[in-house]
Amino acid sequence: MKRIKVLELQKNRGKFEIITNKIAEYKGVCGVWIMYDNHEQLLEVAQTADVFKELAYDLSWLLKEYSCDGDLRKRYTARRLFEFNQKFDVLSCDKNRTTAKYRTIAQNAESILVYLIVEDRATSRDKTVREKVEMEIAIDNKALYWNAFGTQRKLAKDYYKNKYELK
């Protein structure tokens, strides 16, 4: 899979420092991005209509300081679609499931690498094409924190069943 690095974070004294940040070059650009940790484990995959906008939002949550004075009571445990998905808790201090995911990633990873997939299907203007690419990458590489959204859930279950269970 052809890819280019757009973001790299390295933990120093418990906080992420930005090593590489090229996301501004992708304002208004649609695509599919992938996120790895220091163990080369795929953490997340997402398609987006604006790479910069989405990764800037995600980056803000990865760089946030999560202090003990926040409300750390557990609200619920995020649902998993597949066994390979990582369990994580959504706490009272979390804005939503997404922010809880990035809080968990920030606590557990020592470094993060984000790549933009630069293949025709991944850069398609057609959202359904990008969603299919996202789903295939996430399932085939067992992305720990990936979560199918809406109608993508059924497509993901069918894809997994046809590719891995019917053999």
Please identify what each model-predicted range represents.
Residues 1-43, 48-167:
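Boundary/linker segments flanking structured domains
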